A protein has these predicted regions:
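Accessory alpha-helical/coil subdomains and C-terminal extensions
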Residues: 9-10, 16-20, 38-50, 164-247, ...
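ATP/NTP phosphate-donor binding region
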Residues: 2-84
Length: 344
């Protein structure tokens, strides 16, 4: 192998296609993912076929999914493909539907412990097969980022912005700037050049070994409080059905009614082995249990603060910790500690 071939081999990227808008085909019934269709679309993009562009290979999952149908099974499968091919590629691009992309990014950040290569999730709001697709730049730039080995963590790239995967949130259903990271700075901004914010990127030692820690099926639920909520309607599911609960509260962790109806439910859920994590409905800011009287009672009842975690990250983290078969007390403790850059 000559020097040029060696360099190109080191720049090889694996593209994992899970489904989603970016590779969908127009049919009489509307857009749908179609097996083998994306491969021909990619080969028709001149920039992807240039000699000076990183070498790439396509891995197509089966079945291809609309991302609203993504489950733990698919999260584990995506991570398994990365784990089993880790030494063969310098980075990975995961093509994914936008609806649950932030959930998958969060999940991968926990399943792939010790990751020291870029894993970049991206997609599009307009299919590649359409004339005015945002997918071309998203894909091309994601491959470049994956090949450069700077942002060695699970990232999400969309419309000129590289975000930490477990800090990202989908902010627009139809806008091209669909994702933001309200509580964490950008990992990179893309204009004429890719400008990395190296201080914001996770730092890991060169000798870190990648581990594959798949999620197990665990009953997890999300409950969003609202004015007038009748907590009693949710008592059975909170106390008997769920192991982990993400409670989306007002502001910094406040609940309606002073917690009079909710607190006995939380105490009962806690005594039955559930872990209740409090996140804010606000995209920006942090949960501080005890900052207000209405949140102090939550802490006293056994709930833990999700701090500035997104709901997506909190859900994935609960799956992760329960899958490690930790005790309830260990899980409570770890929910408030940073594991993969998910909280400040």
């Amino acid at each position: 192998m000559n020097e040029k071939e060696d360099i190109m081999d080191n720049k090889r990227v694996l593209i994992i296609y899970t489904g989603g808008t970016i590779g969908m085909k127009a049919t009489q019934q509307g857009y749908r993912p179609a097996p083998d269709f994306l491969d021909s679309e990619l080969k028709s993009i001149p920039d992807l076929m240039r000699e000076d562009f990183p070498e790439w290979e396509l891995y197509e999952m089966y079945p291809l999914l609309d991302s609203s149908n993504m489950t733990l099974k698919e999260w584990n499968e995506i991570a398994r493909v990365i784990y089993e091919n880790y030494d063969r590629y310098c980075g990975f691009v995961v093509l994914h539907g936008t609806d649950t992309m932030a959930y998958t990014a969060s999940a991968l950040s926990f399943i792939l412990r010790g990751l020291n290569k870029p894993v970049v999730l991206t997609g599009s709001q307009i299919p590649l097969s359409e004339i005015r697709s945002d997918g071309r730049d998203n894909l091309i730039t994601s491959i470049l980022i994956a090949s450069e080995g700077v942002a060695n963590e699970v990232c999400l790239y969309f419309s000129g912005r590289l975000l930490r995967g477990n800090r990202a949130m989908k902010m627009s259903a139809d806008g091209l700037v669909a994702f933001k990271s309200p509580n964490y700075p950008l990992l990179a901004e893309v204009g004429i050049e890719i400008r990395y914010n190296r201080d914001a990127i996770l730092k890991r030692g060169e000798d870190v070994k990648l581990e594959y820690l798949p999620f197990h099926e665990v009953p997890i639920g999300v409950l969003k409080v609202f004015p007038g909520i009748q907590f009693g309607l949710f008592e059975e599911i909170m106390t008997e059905k769920l192991s982990g609960i993400v409670l989306e509260t007002f502001g910094a962790g406040n609940i309606p009614g002073g917690g009079g109806e909710l607190l006995p439910i939380i105490k009962k859920a806690f005594s039955s082995g559930s872990v209740i994590t409090v996140c804010s409905q606000c995209p920006m800011g942090t949960v501080t249990l005890g900052a207000y009287e209405t949140s102090s009672s939550l802490k006293g009842a056994g709930a833990v603060s999700g701090k500035d975690m997104t709901t997506e990250a909190a859900v994935a983290k609960l799956y992760h910790l329960f899958s490690l078969e930790l005790s309830k007390e260990e899980i409570k403790k770890m929910m408030e500690k940073n594991i993969a850059g998910e909280l400040t």
